[in-house]
Amino acid sequence: MFYCTGEGILWISPDDRLIVSRLPAGTYTDVGQEYRRLALRPCTPSATPAFFLDTPEMRMVRREVEAFFDPAATARLQAVGLRHRRGIILHGPPGTGKRTMMRQLIPFLVERDAVILVDCDADYLEHALIPAIRASDPDRPIVLLFDAFDRDVSLSRAKLLQLLDGLTSPDHLLMIGCTNDFNAIPVQLRNRPSRFGLILRIDRLPDGVHERLAEQKYPTLSPADRQFAVRLTRNLPINFLERVCEMFLAGCDPDEISDRFRAIAPAESTDGHERR
């Protein structure tokens, strides 16, 4: 049971506010520390148009998520006494599209009536948030998204282990975590198929992604400016392309952008060789 404030905050403890017996499908974040009580806030959709990746890795992730919502698969698990849970870890260097892939799943998850909880404390999840969601809706699918999974593991390792694979861990639970440092995740957490059925390393963005992103996200730039930005950042994480495009939007010319770019880019040239 939840109690809604005029600002859209959802308390878990009883209150004299509007009662919300069933959370609408959508994305929520824990704001309990801000309000000193257990509470959720709906996440505001980004005003930036989503950039959709269509890669073999994205299709693998999509199939794994679709399998979680397959009623036949759920029934088979229940028939043999297994909990309905799946876990996915996306790892690799920064700027290779891991978090873009995770965000790209959100519309599909909402269509499947899921409650999506972003970067929530593991102890709150098992002992307060998930029970409150399930109180009036015991089979509701819940999806946990962790933007920096290695950080969350370092803060609450034992709690995450309990949440994922403990005797009281919740049913109908999908967890997706992203990390730039896979080795920071303990072996006992990642080496259990019951916890993470898909662990996927993403080393680089496929060819053509920089061009498509520049065209889709920055349509007001001239083709020449977009091509310049793509050439300058082709072998670098996608956030460098965005920085260069934003410099063009701010009125910088190519020479000025090149000078600024040398100060912010890693020690690697656009042809893949280390700068001297």
Each predicted region: which residue ranges?
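Conserved phosphate/pyrophosphate-binding and hydrolysis machinery centered on Walker-type P-loop NTPases
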Residues: 51-55, 179, 231-237
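Walker A/P-loop NTP-binding motif of AAA+ ATPase domains
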Residues: 56-62, 66-227
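C-terminal alpha-helical "lid" subdomain
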Residues: 2-26, 192-194, 198-276
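AAA+ P-loop ATPase mechanoenzymes
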Residues: 1-95, 101-113, 121, 265, ...
